[in-house]
Swiss-Prot record:
Name of this chain's protein: Small ribosomal subunit protein uS5
Keywords: Ribonucleoprotein, Ribosomal protein, RNA-binding, rRNA-binding
Protein function: With S4 and S12 plays an important role in translational accuracy. Located at the back of the 30S subunit body where it stabilizes the conformation of the head with respect to the body.
InterPro entries named among the record's database cross-references: Ribosomal_Su5_D2-typ_SF, Ribosomal_uS5, Ribosomal_uS5_bac-type, Ribosomal_uS5_C, Ribosomal_uS5_N, Ribosomal_uS5_N_CS, Ribsml_uS5_D2-typ_fold_subgr
Taxon lineage: Bacteria, Bacillati, Actinomycetota, Actinomycetes, Bifidobacteriales
One GO biological process term: translation
Domain of life (superkingdom): Bacteria
């Protein structure tokens, strides 16, 4: 074997060794990345599951609907569902299916699509408000701490899911659950923060809101901040585990 052939053989062996080493390194990196993505995915799934577990849901009513065809009648169910986090976010949904569990599940999904934030001050509404829907009318008034939710079943379900613990309510007109719930949602959507009212009227915050309301609001903000910090600390501890 000549010297040139020997040099060529050595060069080929060196290239093959380098290629094998590079492929092994890439395999290790890909496996490491997959493990990392798996751990991150598991943490993300745990956070989503914990968020789902924190949600409150109330089935207000389930109606049986009958439809007549040539060959007879078919029955289905319609569920009115309220979903909220108990911390100021709530939504109402309506689901239909031939089975009750499926109707409730559809109602929950519909409610989550229509969630909104409710202004609160220390567990109560910010000001008196009236909501309307069809022939139903619902009145909401602020209440002192410890009063509780003075409301009927349909209005109570919305208040509990929205995180309102003290409120005075009155339902007038239609007693149909759908109308009452939608009137309650209309009232909650009309609520405003004191800053919004002051800006709209061109007045200062002290002129619009009484001192007791401002003190309660400051205390509520401090309590909410403390609860949020505790929740973040617990979440960080779980992720570390």
């Amino acid at each position: 074997m000549s010297d040139n052939e020997k040099e060529t053989q050595v060069a080929e062996e060196t290239q093959n060794t380098q290629a094998a080493a590079e492929s092994n390194n890439e395999d290790r990196k890909s496996r490491r990345g997959q493990r990392g993505e798996g751990r991150r995915g598991e943490r993300r799934n745990r956070r989503e599951e914990s968020h789902e577990n924190e949600m409150l849901d109330r089935v207000v009513t389930i109606n049986r609907v009958s439809k007549t065809h040539k060959g007879g009648r078919t029955f289905s169910f319609a569920a009115l569902v309220v979903v909220g986090d108990g911390k100021g976010t709530v939504g109402v949904g309506y689901g239909k299916s031939r089975e009750v569990p499926a109707a409730i599940a559809k109602g929950q999904l519909d409610a989550k699509k229509h969630m909104f934030t409710v202004p609160r001050i220390k567990g109560t509404v910010t000001h008196p408000v009236i909501g309307h829907d069809a022939a139903g009318t619902v009145l909401l008034r602020p209440a002192a701490p410890g009063t509780g939710v003075i409301a009927g079943g349909a209005v109570r379900a919305v208040m509990e899911c929205a995180g309102i613990t003290d409120v005075l309510t009155k339902s007038m007109g239609s007693a149909t659950a759908v109308n009452v719930v939608r009137a309650t949602v209309d009232a909650l959507k009309k609520l405003e923060e004191p800053e919004e009212i002051a800006a709209r009227r061109g007045m200062s915050l002290e002129e619009v809101a009484p001192d007791a309301l401002l003190r309660a609001r400051a205390e509520g903000i401090a309590e909410a901040r403390k609860a949020r910090e505790e929740a973040q600390a617990k979440a960080a501890q779980k992720d570390g585990e």
